[in-house]
């Protein structure tokens, strides 16, 4: 019986017709790529706006509930944003701004206080433990900078990647993650 079934299987395999794929125009491929990218970035934008609303609510009314809501909004926003990562490779338009949204790793001490074993200084980064939240003035590039107002412009143009150091991350998902959950105390060993 088994031999008969195997024989029938192989006989029917030969009867299966395989058709060739139809040629596709390059403009159709590009249009499909653009449509998929637009949908992905649209989803990421919508969830980022919801995250902004949740963070604004947390700032206006800092409670355990508003913190939990902001954390959930961050998690919900990360998934669609991560799905856009495929579009950044080889795309200079995306590469130009992506570091302001998704830069990693970050020196957490730039933003806020950290555990004592984090250290207070770094040979590579003078802002390693600057704690911009607690300090109204910072020294960046050898000059004193007013840090009393943490505006979008200050964060994006002065603090983010200050002194040309990529780990000086002041904007984006990972900076928000640090502010919502605090310092990552899980170590730096193998995962």
Predicted regions and their residues:
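Positively charged n-region of N-terminal signal peptides that target proteins for export
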Residues: 1-4
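Sec/Tat signal peptide C-region and signal peptidase I cleavage site
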Residues: 15-21
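Bacterial N-terminal signal peptides
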Residues: 6-14
